[in-house]
């Protein structure tokens, strides 16, 4: 098919490329009917350029479209070559003072909390950095795409509207000039023509609905039968459904289907098939059939290719228009005129209207293109922004209706543009007054919530999924209303008043439909069967909370509006209460000679609703009357006399009683829906406009009525009237007959009622209720939150109510009430309450939940005990009420109140006769305290002529009336003071009596004689001193008692030791032996310790006893006993890698014998240090395996460990492990017990001997491999072969280990091989020993790096688990050859040896530059016993070790010299060169000679010696660790201290001369020839000639990448990152690899790749190439660190970025500026260096099971 198309397509291209834009434009300039000309041109050319085949070629299409279609338009517009025309236009244009940058997805945006008018006012990064706001309290978020930078918009900022860049452009914007003055008449006319035609064309073709014919003026003569099957996006179907359907319908691979689905999701549509009509129709029917089962089917259309072509070009044109108008404001103005010009069809016929009204029919891509155009044109031209806003408002209802029917998110709907108009204060006011916008929004909202009950209230019963979906969409209207109200008017016009009040009426209608919705009735007898729907109503309430507050703020800003609004609200409340007394019979209540009429109503029997927005709004307005003093200025205008207090309090009181009854457990059978409703009613998100307002409404009612009447009504509603109105009710009640439940219930109700009274009198911190301001209110909230416990900033913010701007006002007051404590390495910064604020603590603070109240009480009492104060928590001193609420305090001294208090105290005095509770008494005491504080304040503030009418002290001193003669309240308190059963409340009662006396004294003293008062204080003082002395005495007694007890205990201990002397003697000996094993305490401090060689320090072998963690049995570690093992974890590692791009192509054929110095991938072993018997471990592992198989049959979930890969959790510490290391005695001591001669060979002799032995072995090896028929010849050859003296190649040493130990040696060896090479286990494979030695070497190198990086001494105190792991690993590696084939190990030794001492049989060996010398050393030393065991000539193993070590050290020195950097640092030493420097210079000259002078010029000896010392240090340290663990020689004490470099000490410990070059001098004869052979290697030559690289020494430590100090620069970097697979599209989840700095696109289909036959996400794939399976990433949009290991393991980790309050912000929800915390970043780096990432993930997954369910491999 393709080949047929090719020539034809090329021909088309040729004809297109021959078009001349200039000629076409010239033709258009002459044309009489320009529209027809342009349309004909487009009809002819567009289908030839776009949509030529199944797959689009965007680059080619764009190039041709520019040449053939857009070029002529640009020529026509400019009247000349656009390359000159546009720059001229640009020059004539004045730069804009508006920034207007449209945000990309994920770009950082900044808002200033001090200056922004509302949170939608944001700046782009560039403007922000150049603005004054960077030093303010700013918020940083990532944009969801769309939206503008508001720099330059004076209405958006209270100050600093311009950044430095845009301020330069503000000089001449005094008066708004017409931008067209800068353009010539011709240009204006031509622009007008071309814009009108192209804009109309684009709108027409994009809104075209026919699928196979074009508009008449675009139809072609000959039409091909080519169609597209076009799939459209919807938000209903999932990715998986779409992918599956496409695979079936168009027969494509999964990868192609994913590609299609990704494009559909991104652009809104994609063709999935190209061909004739029938072919496409068939695919369509399959798609529709497959997706219509559960939901509506996917939208698919079969469209003619020419229509798709024109639509694609239509989009291109809109983008083109957007870029053209960027050249000049004049062009922008013309485009706006064209767009908003009414067409011939009148209303809604302008192009802009047509596009807006077709919005929901357009696909995603088309929408975003035209929204973009509107933003860069209409919204950037202030004159037309206004006109556009009017069109938007006129079409508002229709647009919202379309949005409700649409299923796309609001972000891609034109309705989302509302934020651009409604938040601009002048535009919003204009729309309210001219277009009645407020009423329109609310009415549109009401239209969509049609379900009502018989009373006309909203009914959300049993929402279907679709209704719930619609309801979610309807909520966006509330957001629009919030935008309109967000900035309060500073001045009011009459029209604004009128229209606002019309809107307020509409709002009251909305609230009226909510008043009393979702009513509930108490379930009696049986539990409710179906949980009623409650969420929708609360969602509505939550969304409206801010709107209700803002409505009140608007009312408060104008007195006339406030009065009118109050009247309207009252009228609506009267309507709601229309049937308030109907059908409910009146009753009369009387207590203490007061009586009141009310209705019979029981909350526990009738319907009751928690939703009372109208009452609550009235309460809010009533407080505003008080706050703004309107109530006192214009009482005649207010209907205050018409108010019926009983009616006002009725519904809020019912609501509070409902809460009390729920708490008393009376509504248990109503299920969770009610519990949830009560929770949200009090919750910080809703309480401001629910619970708080109910309290205010009750305060309002009480302040207007006789408090006795109120209390009686309240008792009646609480269903407690009987108890307090009949004197002996309590006695009867407590007799045996009654139900315990009922007693408990009534007690709780009494407690709740008393709590309510405390609230009504005590809660006066709302401005308008009490004489306070807003900051007092916030301070009080914070004090009470911090009195529970110290809190982090974010916790505090969560517990405070936010206003519409997401502000709590906390920052302005927090310094006054709290201290800030900075965080450590983990945790967060905390605020602690200042001690002086504790006195403001109110135990019955109304925003405490039950749990918080008890915590706060506990905390405050504890604090008082610590400060040696009494533990009473008296009520705090309160601010006075505002005049409107002043009469509220009288409730405390009303007769009914005193009766209630008296009754409860009476119960407490006769505590056995009645049912009462301590909580009840505690509340009564609190109320008495409040009354006393109140009276005290009245007396303190009294003026001459006033009499204090508050006489609580007198009333509580009076005993009861005649017949009963009950004692006075005061008398009862004095009785209770000494009651033993009220220990807890003693302090409080004492405080009350003390305060009572003080108040009494104040009453008695007239204003002229204040003497009595001072006496009172003196008396108080003396009593306080007494208290103090008493406490001191008690403390002293307690101290003496403690000392006596301690003395007795130590005497008993001594006695016990004396009696059991011999027992202690044994344990002490044992302790000494175990500590010797642990601490390697030096044997003799004065002798030199040597780790290897014939002079090795001989250490007596300590016996080692260990205990199995599984069976608790103790056992000695011996050669012949059962194996003991350590749990271990082996993993591949690139932590030390200097080359991450290396990859083993074919692990089956790879030979790991030589490790390259770049350490590209090593095998690391770690252990938690816990010991088990091998057989116990085997049993444990089998049970884990069996359990896992059972679990897999039940659940297809991953666990934190992968049993199939041999993983398990350590039974003790749950540390992830995948194998076990056997515990062994030092293996060298076992094999080294042969006779050793005293004269050992020197290096030269030893090398010759070894070379001969190797030759013999190779000869025999050859013999064995030759076929038998040549046997006669062979025997001659054997004679010919002179075996070196004492060498017996046929000897096989006896292996001393028990079977169990051998098995474990094999187990661990195989595990290392399997993990290290990523192959299947095979214990016979010759590479197993190599991998064991490699793991030992690599692990030691890792530890050495960690110690060096942290400047810790080499043999300082290592953590136990590390020490055990290194010891066991080294001993294992040294013993492993015993279970491998001797000849294989010998073969490895020969090859390793040949890399340093060349022989003829090994040709292809790496050159000296390409061998890591420490790996080579470990390999040679550990393979050597396989050769040495056949040598009976008396050469000891130690000699071999020493010579190998010296040889490798010399090779390493040569490596260092060859690669040393010879740039001089200008630091030449003045002194004469020392011995080392001369020696190293001589050696360098030798090298210079052997390399044929290719080596660089000879630097100074000082410089060379410094290079050698620095370069060899890591090697020496690793060697010291290795030989220390291999031979068990303790480390010299000098190396155990931090500080100096320890070079000399290391040399001495390792049997090296301090002047390392002496090694060369002592063995010069053999060394010179070896050096020559090393330098002759062609690779060395290539390196010296600059043709290749080599590693330099010392290797630098790898670090994680450098992160920027400020997090926003990371966000910015990530927002510029395009997904590599989706054609320049911004990535949705940019993720930064912290190891190498690559940015990846994670968590989306686009970047999945295949790894080992499975689909994996970009991060997982990257971990394999960069971290050999382990990855550390930072998810930039979430500010979250991601750890990955393998394909199934991962966890999230706390990021290293903190805000100013020491907290992380995962998910960037709070938006506080974040800065890098270096310590936390170091901690992550340390985890990486220590290879602990996998362990960290394991622990996290065990601790949090939700992590196991995450699909890590697709991240």
UniProtKB/Swiss-Prot annotation:
Q: Where does Zn(2+) 3 bind?
A: 127, 151, 163, 166
Q: Which residues bind Zn(2+) 5?
A: 1168, 1170, 1210, 1213
User: Where in the sequence is Phosphotyrosine found?
Assistant: 1697
Coarse class of the protein's main subcellular location: nucleus
Consequence of mutating residue 1694 to A?
A: Enhances interaction with BTRC and undergoes DUSP22-mediated degradation
Quaternary state and interactors: Interacts with UBE2B; promotes the UBE2B-H2A interaction and the ubiquitination of histone H2A by UBE2B and UBR2. Interacts with RECQL4. Interacts with TEX19; does not lead to TEX19 degradation and stabilizes it. Interacts with CASP8. Interacts with ATXN3. Interacts with UBE2O.
- Where composition is biased (Basic and acidic residues), the residues are 1021-1034
Q: Which residues bind a peptide?
A: 148, 150, 153
Gene that encodes it: UBR2
What does the PTM comment state?
A: Dephosphorylated by DUSP22 at Ser-1694 and Tyr-1697, leading to subsequent ubiquitination and proteasomal degradation.
The record places its UBR-type zinc fingers at: 97-168
A GO molecular function held by the record? zinc ion binding
Chain sites annotated for binding Zn(2+) 1: 99, 124, 127, 149
Which PROSITE patterns has this protein been placed in? ZF_UBR
The UniProt similarity line reads: Belongs to the E3 ubiquitin-protein ligase UBR1-like family.
Q: Which UniProt keywords apply?
A: Acetylation, Chromosome, Coiled coil, Isopeptide bond, Metal-binding, Nucleus, Phosphoprotein, Transferase, Ubl conjugation, Ubl conjugation pathway, Zinc, Zinc-finger
Q: What is this protein called in UniProt?
A: E3 ubiquitin-protein ligase UBR2
| Zn-finger (RING-type) residues | 1108-1214
Q: Where does tissue-level expression of this protein occur?
A: Broadly expressed, with highest levels in skeletal muscle, kidney and pancreas. Present in acinar cells of the pancreas (at protein level).
Annotated region (Disordered), positions in chain: 1004-1034, 1261-1287
Q: What is known of its domains?
A: The RING-H2 zinc finger is an atypical RING finger with a His ligand in place of the fourth Cys of the classical motif. The UBR-type zinc finger forms a pocket that mediates recognition of type 1 N-degrons. It exhibits preference for arginine in the first position, and a lower preference for lysine and histidine. It binds N-degrons with a methylated arginine or lysine in the first position.
Q: Does the keyword Transferase apply?
A: yes
For the ligand (Zn(2+) 4), the binding residues are 1108, 1111, 1173, 1176
């Amino acid at each position: 098919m393709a080949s047929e198309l090719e020539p034809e397509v090329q021909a088309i291209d040729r004809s297109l490329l021959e078009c001349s834009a200039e000629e076409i434009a010239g033709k258009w300039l002459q044309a009489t009917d320009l529209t027809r000309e342009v349309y004909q041109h487009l009809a002819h050319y567009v289908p030839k350029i776009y949509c030529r085949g199944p797959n689009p070629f965007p680059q080619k299409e764009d190039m041709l479209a520019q040449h053939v279609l857009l070029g002529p338009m640009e020529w026509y517009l400019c009247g000349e070559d656009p390359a000159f025309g546009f720059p001229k236009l640009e020059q004539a244009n004045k730069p804009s003072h508006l920034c207007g940058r449209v945000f990309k997805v994920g770009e950082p945006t900044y808002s200033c909390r001090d200056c922004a008018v509302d949170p939608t006012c944001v700046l782009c990064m560039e403007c922000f950095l150049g603005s004054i706001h960077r030093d303010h309290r700013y918020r940083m978020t990532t944009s969801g795409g769309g939206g503008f930078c508001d720099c330059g918009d004076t209405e958006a900022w209270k100050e600093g509207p311009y950044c430095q860049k845009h301020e330069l452009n503000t000089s001449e914007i005094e008066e708004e000039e017409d931008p067209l003055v800068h353009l010539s008449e011709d240009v204006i006319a031509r622009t007008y023509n071309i814009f009108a035609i192209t804009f109309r064309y684009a709108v027409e073709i994009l809104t075209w609905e026919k699928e196979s014919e074009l508009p008449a003026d675009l139809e072609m003569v000959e039409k091909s039968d080519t169609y597209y099957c076009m799939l459209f996006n919807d938000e209903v179907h999932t990715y998986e459904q779409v992918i599956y359907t496409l695979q079936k319908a168009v027969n494509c691979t999964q990868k192609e289907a994913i590609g299609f689905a990704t494009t559909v999701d991104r652009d809104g549509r994609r063709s999935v098939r190209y061909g004739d009509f029938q072919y496409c129709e068939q695919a369509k029917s399959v798609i529709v059939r497959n997706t219509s089962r559960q939901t509506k089917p996917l939208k698919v259309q079969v469209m003619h290719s020419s229509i798709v072509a024109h639509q694609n070009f239509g989009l291109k044109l809109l983008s083109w228009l957007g870029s053209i108008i960027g050249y000049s404001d004049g062009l922008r103005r013309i485009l706006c005129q064209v767009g908003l010009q009414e067409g011939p069809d009148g209303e809604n016929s302008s192009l802009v209207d047509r596009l807006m009204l077709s919005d929901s029919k357009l696909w995603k891509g088309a929408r975003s293109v035209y929204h973009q155009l509107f933003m860069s044109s209409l919204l950037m031209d202030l004159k037309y922004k206004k006109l556009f806003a009017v069109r938007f408002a006129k079409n508002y209802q229709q647009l919202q209706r379309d949005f409700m029917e649409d299923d796309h998110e609001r972000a891609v709907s034109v309705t989302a543009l509302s934020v651009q108009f409604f938040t601009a204060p002048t535009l919003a006011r204009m729309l309210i007054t001219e277009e009645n916008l407020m009423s329109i929004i609310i009415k549109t909202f009401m239209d969509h919530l049609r379900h009502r009950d018989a009373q006309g209230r909203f009914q959300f019963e049993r929402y279907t999924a679709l209704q719930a979906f619609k309801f979610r969409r309807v909520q966006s209207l509330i957001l629009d209303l919030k935008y309109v109200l967000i900035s309060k008017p500073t001045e009011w016009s009459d029209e604004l008043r009128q229209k606002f009040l019309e809107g307020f009426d509409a709002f009251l209608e909305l609230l009226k439909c909510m008043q009393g919705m979702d009513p509930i009735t108490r379930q009696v007898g049986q539990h409710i069967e179906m949980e009623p729907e409650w969420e929708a109503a609360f969602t509505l309430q939550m969304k409206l909370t801010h709107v209700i507050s803002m409505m009140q703020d608007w009312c408060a800003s104008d007195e006339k509006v406030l009065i009118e609004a109050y009247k309207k609200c009252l009228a609506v409340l009267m309507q709601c209460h229309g049937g308030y007394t109907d059908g409910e019979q009146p009753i009369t209540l009387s207590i203490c000679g007061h009586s009141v009429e009310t209705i019979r109503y029981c909350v526990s029997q009738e319907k009751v609703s928690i939703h009372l927005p109208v009452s609550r709004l009235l309460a809010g307005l009533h407080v505003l009357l008080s706050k703004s003093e309107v109530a006192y200025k214009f009482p005649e205008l207010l209907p205050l006399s018409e108010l019926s207090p009983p009616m006002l309090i009725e519904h809020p009181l019912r609501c509070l009683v409902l809460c009390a009854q729920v708490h008393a457990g009376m509504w248990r059978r109503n299920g969770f829906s009610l519990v949830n409703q009560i929770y949200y009613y009090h919750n910080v998100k809703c309480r401001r406009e629910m619970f708080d307002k109910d309290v205010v409404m009750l305060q309002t009612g009480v302040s207007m009525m006789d408090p006795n009447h109120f209390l009686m009504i309240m008792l009646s509603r609480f269903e407690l009237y009987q108890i307090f109105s009949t004197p002996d009710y309590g006695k009867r009640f407590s007799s045996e007959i009654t139900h315990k439940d009922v007693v408990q219930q009534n007690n709780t109700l009494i407690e709740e009622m008393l709590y309510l009274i405390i609230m009504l009198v005590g809660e006066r911190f709302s401005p308008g209720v009490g004489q306070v301001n807003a900051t007092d209110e916030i301070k009080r909230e914070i004090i009470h939150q911090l009195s529970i416990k110290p809190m982090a900033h974010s916790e505090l913010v969560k517990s405070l109510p936010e206003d519409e701007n997401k502000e709590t006002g906390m920052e302005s007051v927090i310094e006054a009430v709290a201290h800030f404590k900075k965080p450590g390495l983990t945790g967060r910064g905390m605020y602690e309450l200042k001690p002086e604020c504790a006195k403001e603590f109110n135990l019955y603070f109304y925003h405490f939940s039950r749990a918080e109240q008890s915590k706060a009480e506990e905390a405050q009492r504890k604090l008082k005990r610590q400060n040696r104060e009494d533990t009473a928590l008296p009520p705090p001193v309160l601010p006075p009420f505002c005049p409107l609420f002043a009469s509220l305090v009288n409730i405390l001294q009303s007769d009914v109140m005193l009766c209630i208090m008296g009754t409860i105290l009476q119960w407490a005095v006769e505590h056995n006769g009645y049912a009462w509770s301590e909580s009840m008494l505690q509340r009564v005491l609190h109320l008495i305290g409040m009354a006393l504080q109140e009276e005290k304040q009245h007396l303190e503030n009294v003026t001459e002529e006033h009499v204090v009418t508050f006489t609580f002290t007198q009333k509580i001193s009076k005993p009861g009336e005649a017949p009963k003669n009950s004692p006075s309240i005061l008398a009862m308190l004095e009785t209770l003071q000494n009651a033993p059963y009220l220990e807890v409340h003693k302090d409080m009662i004492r405080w009350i009596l003390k305060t009572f006396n003080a108040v009494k004294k104040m009453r008695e003293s007239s204003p002229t004689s204040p003497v009595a008062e001072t006496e009172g204080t003196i008396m108080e003082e003396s009593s306080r001193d007494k208290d103090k002395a008493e406490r001191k005495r008690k403390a002293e007694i307690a101290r003496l008692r403690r000392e006596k007890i301690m003395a007795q205990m130590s005497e008993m201990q001594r006695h016990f030791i004396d009696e059991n002397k011999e027992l202690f003697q044994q344990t002490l000996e044992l302790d000494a032996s175990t500590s010797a094993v642990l601490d390697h305490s030096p044997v003799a401090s004065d002798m030199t310790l040597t780790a290897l060689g014939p002079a090795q320090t001989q250490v007596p072998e300590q016996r080692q006893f260990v205990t199995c963690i599984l069976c608790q049995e103790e056992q000695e570690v011996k050669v012949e006993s059962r194996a003991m093992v350590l749990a271990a974890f082996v993993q591949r590692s690139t932590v030390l890698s200097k080359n991450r791009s290396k990859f083993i192509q074919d692990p089956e054929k790879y030979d790991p014998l030589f490790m390259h110095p770049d350490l590209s991938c090593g095998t690391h072993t770690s252990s938690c240090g816990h010991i088990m018997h091998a057989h116990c471990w085997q049993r444990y592992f089998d049970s884990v395996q069996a359990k896992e198989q059972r679990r897999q049959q039940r659940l297809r979930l991953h666990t934190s460990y992968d049993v199939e890969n041999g993983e398990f959790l350590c039974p003790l510490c749950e540390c992830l492990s995948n194998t076990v290391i056997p515990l062994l005695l030092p293996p060298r001591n076992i094999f080294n017990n042969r006779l050793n001669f005293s004269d050992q060979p020197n290096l030269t002799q030893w090398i010759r001997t070894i070379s001969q032995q190797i030759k013999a072995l190779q000869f025999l090896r050859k013999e064995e491999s030759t076929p038998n028929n040549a046997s006669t010849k062979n025997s001659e050859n054997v004679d010919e072969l002179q075996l070196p003296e004492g060498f017996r190649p046929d000897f096989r040493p006896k292996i001393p280990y028990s079977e169990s130990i051998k098995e474990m040696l094999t187990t661990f060896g195989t595990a290392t091989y399997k993990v290290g090479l990523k192959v299947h286990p095979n214990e016979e494979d010759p590479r197993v020993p190599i991998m064991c030695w490699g793991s030992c070497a690599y692990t030691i190198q890792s530890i050495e790096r960690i110690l060096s990086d942290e400047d810790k001494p080499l043999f300082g105190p290592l953590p136990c688990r590390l020490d055990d792991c290194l010891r066991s690993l080294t001993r294992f590696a040294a013993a492993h050859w015993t279970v491998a084939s001797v000849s294989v190990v010998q073969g490895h030794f020969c090859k390793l040896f040949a890399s340093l001492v060349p022989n003829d049989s090994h040709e292809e060996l790496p050159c000296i530059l390409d061998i890591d010398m420490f790996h080579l050393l470990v390999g040679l030393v550990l393979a050597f016993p396989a050769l040495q065991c056949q040598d009976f000539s008396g050469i000891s193993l130690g000699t071999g070790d020493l010579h190998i070590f010296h040889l490798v050290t010399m090779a390493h020195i040569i490596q260092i010299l060859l690669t040393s950097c010879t740039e001089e640092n200008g630091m030449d030493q003045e002194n004469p060169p020392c011995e080392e420097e001369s020696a190293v210079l001589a050696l360098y000259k030798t090298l210079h000679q052997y390399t044929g002078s290719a080596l660089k010029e000879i630097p100074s000896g000082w410089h060379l010696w410094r290079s050698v010392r620095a370069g060899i240090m890591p090697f020496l340290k690793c060697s010291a660790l290795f030989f220390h663990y291999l031979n068990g020689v303790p480390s010299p004490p000098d190396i155990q201290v931090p500080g100096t470099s320890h070079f000399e000490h290391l040399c001495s410990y390792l049997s090296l001369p301090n002047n390392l070059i002496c090694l060369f001098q002592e063995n010069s004869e053999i060394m010179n020839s070896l050096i020559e052979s090393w330098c002759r290697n062609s690779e060395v030559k290539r390196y010296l000639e600059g043709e290749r690289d080599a590693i330099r020494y010392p290797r630098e430590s790898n670090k994680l990448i450098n992160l920027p100090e400020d997090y926003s620069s990371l966000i910015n970097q990530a927002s510029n990152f395009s997904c590599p697979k989706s054609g320049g599209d911004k990535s949705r989840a940019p993720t930064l690899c912290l190891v190498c700095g690559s940015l990846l696109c994670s968590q989306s289909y686009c970047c999945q790749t295949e790894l080992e036959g499975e689909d994996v996400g970009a991060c997982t794939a990257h971990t394999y190439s960069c971290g050999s399976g382990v990855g550390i990433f930072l998810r930039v949009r979430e500010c979250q660190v991601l750890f990955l290991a393998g394909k199934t393991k991962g966890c999230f980790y706390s990021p290293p970025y903190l805000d100013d309050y020491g907290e992380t912000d995962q998910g960037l929800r709070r938006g506080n500026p974040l800065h890098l915390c270096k310590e936390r970043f170091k901690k992550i780096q340390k985890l990486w260096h220590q290879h602990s990432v996998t362990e960290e993930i394991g622990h996290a997954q065990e601790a949090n099971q939700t992590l196991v369910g995450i699909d890590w491999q697709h991240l």
